[in-house]
Amino acid sequence: GLPTAAADSAVPPAAIVAQLRGEYRSETLADGTLQGTERFTLTRHSDGSRSLQMLADLRSRGSWFNVYLHVDADFRPVTAFATYWTAGLLKGSGLFEIQGDALRATSRGPVSGAQSRATAVPARFSIGAHPVSGDGWHTAHYDRQTGGVQALSLYSVDAGADPSKPVLGTLLPLSVEYLGEEQVTVPAGTFMAQRFRLAGLNDLWVYGPDRLVVKSELPRRGIRYVLVTLAGEGEAIEQPKQQR
């Protein structure tokens, strides 16, 4: 029979609860010379999971990264996809799917060809796909009550310039240390952020429940990333204080 009026007016559950969009600037620590830019969209879904779409233009290195990450409500990776251009050439693309304690990766590149790899993964780990937008998620499983330097697990994806190496990853230990809360001001505004140190050499200022990176500094490389713009919509989006 014909659908009822009630059926016609039924609205399906929303796929998106909230969304953040922004851009980073990569610059030298010495004099602020522009090294690249990165744009992202962070989406909070109705099931509590989150996804990140990231476009990183590393113009100083002739590189361009297109990355998608999806994690569950506890920040455990579900799916990831990455396409890397390095040194002006297409390195390839990789698909990463997690089911239980297995991560299955498939890579295809013009030089490396088609390759696949299965990796056993722990209950708590993160994926390192290299855009700074996703780096805050490496801190999600840090236990602040325990404190100190903690060894977490990182699945690091190869984004190097060698086109013969596939876009596959390796499970590695990642040391993470919590350094306290700090107010930090960047072009996007002023944030009360949590400061972490990754691998003893990368300081991150992470903000809010979505673990958004506000600033990242790598002194050994002489590089800093700062959040330049931020816009949000949806539930429980906290807006930062704007610079005056």
Locations of regions flagged by a protein language model:
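N-terminal mature ectodomain segment of secretory-pathway/periplasmic proteins
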Residues: 28-111, 211-218
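Hydrophobic alpha-helical segments, especially N-terminal targeting/anchoring helices
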Residues: 71, 184-185, 206-207
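Solvent-exposed helix/loop surface patches that form functional interfaces
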Residues: 11-35, 98-191
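Mixed-charge, low-complexity segments
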Residues: 10-27, 42, 48-49, 54, ...
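Short, low-complexity, Pro/Ser/Thr/Gly-rich segments in the mature regions of secreted, periplasmic
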Residues: 222-244
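Short, small/polar residue-rich loop motifs at catalytic or cofactor-binding pockets
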Residues: 63-65, 177-178, 199-201
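Bacterial Sec-dependent signal peptides at the C-terminal "C-region" and cleavage site
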Residues: 1-10
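Extended soluble regions of mature proteins
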Residues: 76-79, 189-228
